[in-house]
Amino acid sequence: MSAWIGWKPRSCDPRVASSRLRCLGPLAELQSRGYPVELFEPRHLDRYAAIVYSKVYDDASYHQALELRRKGSRIIFDLCDNHFYNPRSLKYWEEARERLRRMMTLADALVASTEALAETMQRELAPDRAITVIGDPVETAIDNYPMPRWRRWLALRQWASVLAKLKVDQNQGRTPLVWFGNHGSPYAEGGMLDLQRIRPVMEQINRQYPISVTVISNSRWKYERSIKPWALPTYYLSWHPATFLHAVRAHAIAVIPISHNPFTLCKSNNRLALALHEGLAVVADMIPSYREFGKACCLGDWEAGLKRYLADPHLRTAHVALGKAIVDDQWSMPRVADRWQKLFDRVLAKNNIASAPHPKDRAGLSYREL
């Protein structure tokens, strides 16, 4: 058996954020270092010393992992969402919970995207199980995945239309705000409709400080029904890798309202960190993973936070600079890949298999095991 690691995400679709953040991005970074890791390939089962199952715990994957473990491979299971949360007591998610617990019990190493999620996972396991916390990296480039040309053309055309409207607004003194993210989940509250909670504040502030709101998401229907009727200019842009980061950078402030429940409280800091890294001030609701950015954004008080930023561009600039420093120190792709590499080295060492040499000694690894 060689020292190779196979990484199996739930989806290889680059439009799925968890696929990029929990597999494709770190994998590409590690491959650029010459580290022996690849996207899982069934034809290469005999070469894998370890396999990462990223949010994958269906029956077929479980039995595959069971057989690979019997043959000596190490199993790593990574989770980035609280799939134990089932507020509607749906049968599907009750069964999924059992499958998830089964996969975690089988795994030799467990990874969670946040400390809150690690604590949730811990409650489902034996008290002595260790869980490694490896957060999401901040992406600096997304438009390097293959996409149909016609989709790219359509996305660029749509973005040009929105950008033209933003320029007109800015010439009229409007400050552009943005919300971006998945429109929502079928099994937990949250997503685009969280904006409804701050609608009264936004409409009131718009009378004093003219603003616009752009929604970058994956449900125009939900936007048309719930956001477009607001009493201020709003725009919709379908998420696409060719336009997303350009669109985010065209705004001044990101708004991230979050309904508190066991699902959202386990989410990572990725949206907040990405917005700060791209130069936007951020007003958001507090969740545990946002705590380290508390001095680089406005958390919790929507009216006061928005008014502070709209009245004081210099404060926005100062907070963005502080936020970027935190991201560069802790949440860049190379830094997060370091944590994955350290985990893989440890797992391979238990099999008495040497990993590829580190291209360079990286200081200041932020690695923690709960």
What would you call each of these model-derived segments?
Residues 6-29, 139-250:
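Conserved catalytic-core segment of nucleotide-activated headgroup transferases in glycan assembly
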Residues 51-52, 105-115, 132:
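A short beta-strand/loop micro-motif in the catalytic core of glycosyltransferases
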Residues 311-349, 363:
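A charged, aromatic-enriched C-terminal amphipathic alpha-helix characteristic of glycosyltransferases
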Residues 51, 68-84:
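Active-site proximal beta-strand in glycosyltransferases
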Residues 93-110:
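Membrane-proximal helix-turn-helix segments that form the acceptor-binding/catalytic region
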Residues 116, 137:
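Carbohydrate-associated surface elements
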Residues 85, 187-193, 241-242, 246-247, ...:
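Nucleotide-sugar-dependent
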